[in-house]
C-alpha cells in the first residue's frame, strides 16, 4: 500500500501536474488570459475537492463498505480522472511557440543556470514555498478546536471557513485581474490575510471573531492562490527574453516541488512546535506552554509567513515589463 501511494502521489500525480500547470503559460501569452486560466484551475480544484470529499463515503457504502470498497472507490475516481485528462489532451493546444534558438535542446546544467539568473523565478518559488509551509500548518485545526475552543466538533466549521472563502474570492479574480496587476492583487490579498490573522490572534478564544477572521483570511488567500501559477507563465516569458532559454517544465515543476515540500515542512514545523511546547497527546489537560504553541501554529506563525510573502512580492516588478517582453518575443518568434 505504501509503495502504491508513493508511486501514485510522487510519481503519477507529479508527472501529471507539472505539464498541466505549465499549460497556463503555453496556451496563451496574454497575462490576463493566464490569470483567467489560473482562476478556472483554482475554482475547479476547490469544487472537485469538495465533490470528491462529499462522494467518498456514499460510494464506499455503495460498494459494500468493506476494505475492498475503498479500492473500488479509488479505482472509480482514477478512471474518471483518466477520462478527463484524455479529454484535456484532445482539446488543448499549446499556442506559445518558442523561437528557433529557444527550442533547441538545452543541457540541464545550462537550464538550471538560466533559472537562477531569473530573479522573478527565485521570488515566486520562495513565495510559493512559504505559502505552502503556512498551508501545511492546517493540521493544527483539530488541536485548536479541542484545546483552545473546548469543542472538537468545531473543527468542521474551521475547515469549511478555511477553504470556502478562497473559492468565493477566486470568483472575482478575473474582474480584478482585468483592472489591476497580479502583483497588486497579490499584495492586497496578503494585507487582507494579515487582517484576518490579526483578528484571530487578538481574539483567540472568541469563536465568532475567529470565524470572521477565517473568512477574511480566506478572501485574502484567493488572489495569491489564483495569481501564483499565472505569474509563473510570465516568469517563463521573462526567462526566454533574458537568457534565450524557455524552461516552462522546470519553472512549473519547481512550483509543484514547492507545493509538496512546503506542505511537508509545514507539517514538520507543526510537530516540532507542539513538542517544544510540551504537548501531551493523551493528556487530560495541557500546559500553558502547550496551549501557546497551539495558538502560535494557528495564528502567529501564519501571520509571520504572510508578512514574509508580502515582502517577497514587493520585489516582483515584472508586470510592468510584460508588454515590452511580449513584443520582443513575438518579433523573435516571427524571425526565428
Residue ranges of model-derived segments:
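Membrane-embedded alpha-helical bundles of multi-pass transporters/translocases
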Residues: 1-336
